[in-house]
């Protein structure tokens, strides 16, 4: 499954419990079409005690969300935006904001 965002992109959540929040993409899972975004979709994980860790604990961490729930954030527009692919004169392919033509 093709994912429209890359690692270290700034994205905005457009639906779900974290709607409107922005964060940086930490990891992309192209096979499942999910992304891990910093500070978004926080879940509680119950950690069992083991030899290296003496006590059990409840840890809060990010969980992956579907890539269709995020849009790329344009720093120039200060808004979520769709992206277009543009080929420059030297043949390199870049991602461009559809609203203001800012390159990513």
UniProtKB/Swiss-Prot annotation:
CDD domains, A to Z: KOW_RPL26 (cd06089)
One GO molecular-function entry: rRNA binding
Domain of life: Bacteria
Keyword terms of this UniProt record: Ribonucleoprotein, Ribosomal protein, RNA-binding, rRNA-binding
BP GO annotations: translation
Stretches of the chain forming a coiled coil according to its record: none
Gene Ontology terms: cellular component: ribonucleoprotein complex; ribosome
Pfam families: KOW, ribosomal_L24
Quaternary structure, from the entry: Part of the 50S ribosomal subunit.
Family: Belongs to the universal ribosomal protein uL24 family.
Purpose of the protein: One of two assembly initiator proteins, it binds directly to the 5'-end of the 23S rRNA, where it nucleates assembly of the 50S subunit. One of the proteins that surrounds the polypeptide exit tunnel on the outside of the subunit.
Name the UniProt record assigns to this protein: Large ribosomal subunit protein uL24
